[in-house]
Amino acid sequence: MFIALGIQLFVAVTYAAGKDDEHFSVDYCGMNCTQQEDGSWTACSGRNEECRCYHESGKKNGLCLSTTYIDFSQYGNPSDSDIAAASPRP
């Protein structure tokens, strides 16, 4: 049922996995979501509202997932002299 969603997530994770300075993760929140008669979707609760409903077009069932993306290239290199200069000294 969620083959297309799984493929999209796999492609996203595979793309990010090839880069050492990026991290992308997807976690299942332990619940599903469904489309209501009025077109709205049931809420995904838990994890401080990090969970969102992801569903395929035209489907009435979805998965509650939490996604995380971090671009480590925005941070300095750990061997940068500025970091060493800012370190506490004894």
Swiss-Prot record:
A GO CC annotation given for this chain: extracellular region
Keyword vocabulary terms for this entry: Disulfide bond, Glycoprotein, Secreted, Signal
Coiled coil: none
Domain of life: Eukaryota
S-S pairs: C29-C51, C33-C53, C44-C64
Keyword Protein biosynthesis: no
Secretion signal, residue range per the UniProt entry: 1-18
Glycan attachment sites: N32
GO molecular function, one term: C-X-C chemokine binding
Subcellular location: Secreted
Keyword Lipid metabolism applies: no
Protein function: Salivary chemokine-binding protein which binds to host chemokines CXCL1, CXCL2, CXCL3, CXCL5 and CXCL8.
Protein name as catalogued: Evasin P1128
Organism: Ixodes ricinus (Common tick)
